[in-house]
Every structure is written in structure tokens, then in C-alpha cells.
Amino acid sequence: MTEFVTSADGTRIAYDVEGSGPPVILVGGAMQFRAFDPITSEMAQHLAGHGFAVVNYDRRGRGESPADAPITLAQTIDDLRALTDELTEGADDAVALFGNSSGASIALAAAAAGLPVSRLVFFEAPLDEEGGEDGAVFLAELRERIAAGDRVGTLEAYMSDMPPEWLEGAKQSPGWSTMLEIAPSLEPDAESLAWTQSGPRAELWRDISTHGGPPVEDLARSAWPVAQNGTATG
């Protein structure tokens, strides 16, 4: 059942909770929200079955969490703080954050901003170099497209460093209209990715253990020589 929490600026954030136990918040990436991403909902149910209270939420500007542009990383972190307060009943207890794709950089930024986080878990975190010095060019171009109301251009700018066939496939897919609708909500994704390029990497990555291949493995090793790497089966 959908519940709502009110963020610092009054925006209502829609979410579901599955199970009970230590709290885990699932932070979606670029195109993810509950009605558009059944796989994350399935994962929430799976984790709940292993003794966790799992929050799957619609990020600001998506699904049942409507908001006007511009949508900032700071606002997105405020939304996570509101969810955390709701889960812990204001006790400031720590929560685990699972970040998928660019949701990983948002989760990392939230932890760096002081959100009480017990664990950070990333899946396919795109934390390699973004275009332009410190990601600034990438972010500036996206913001320019959003400010102009150019939703097609926003998606094209965001996907500019991805294989061209991914963008063409998206344009031909039934979900393209939904992607256009939520395009302004990509700004926090871009802002957080740019932030990872300008932050103190050794501090950000020193406690990271990676499971799988690049880019996270390479980035962690370059930032902190004792970073661990492992591969999980299944």
C-alpha cells in the first residue's frame, strides 16, 4: 500500500514498505520508479523475506511524487532524510541504502551529507569519469536542456556517453513517453555523478568492497590501494 512522507519543502514522497526488521531504502537510478520498474519491487519483496524493512519509493518528479523542475540533489537528499526519519520514528538510527546505477551516487552523496547510514550497497554504479572537467560540462548541458523544456534533448544529453543504440532503442520503446515525462528528474542523477568526480576520492572510497568488474573496481583501487574485490555467485 502506498504511503506518503512530507519532505523539507513540503513535497510529498510516495513509498511502499515491505517486511520488518533493519531498514533498507532502495534508491533508484535514472529511469526508475515503482510503476515503471517491477524488478525493484520484486527485489523489495525478496529482501523483506530475509528479515528487512524495505522501502521502495518514487523519487521526486516521478510516479506519485510529482514536483516541478528544477529538481536538485539537495532536495533529493532531503527526501531520503524524510524517509529515514519516518522509518526510525525520528530516532536518528541508521538505515542501509541500496543504490542502483546513478542511485548509487545519490546514496553516496546522502551519506556524505550526514544521513545516518549503516551500509551502502551499490549495483552497476556508473562512477567512472563524466564528460568535462569534474563532470561540470555534463551537468551544465543537462541543466540547460531542462531549463529550456527540451525533454528529448535532456534524455539525449544524459545518455550521450552510452552506446547510441541504447538511445535509439529507448526512443522506439513503449516506455519512451514515460521517460520524456520524468526527464527533468534526471538533474539529481547528473549532479551526483558530477559530484563524485570532484569529491575527495580517497575518503569516499576507503571502506568500499567491490564485487564484480569495472568501473567501480578500477575506481576504488585507484583511489585507495587496499580496496577489496570479490565475485559472488548466483
Where in this protein do the model-derived segments appear?
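Conserved HGGG/HGGXW glycine-rich cap/lid loop of the alpha/beta-hydrolase fold
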Residues: 4-66
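Short hydrophobic segments within beta-strands
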Residues: 26-30, 98, 212
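Short amphipathic alpha-helical segments and helix-helix/interface helices
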Residues: 41-45, 84, 143, 183, ...
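Alpha-helical elements of Rossmann-like donor-binding domains used by nucleotide-donor carbohydrate transfer enzymes
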Residues: 42, 75-82, 141, 153, ...
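Active-site loop/oxyanion-hole signature of alpha/beta-hydrolase fold enzymes
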Residues: 45-49, 56-95
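Helix-rich cap/lid subdomain of alpha/beta-hydrolase
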Residues: 125-177, 187-194, 204
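Conserved serine/cysteine hydrolase catalytic core
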Residues: 175-221, 227-228, 232-234
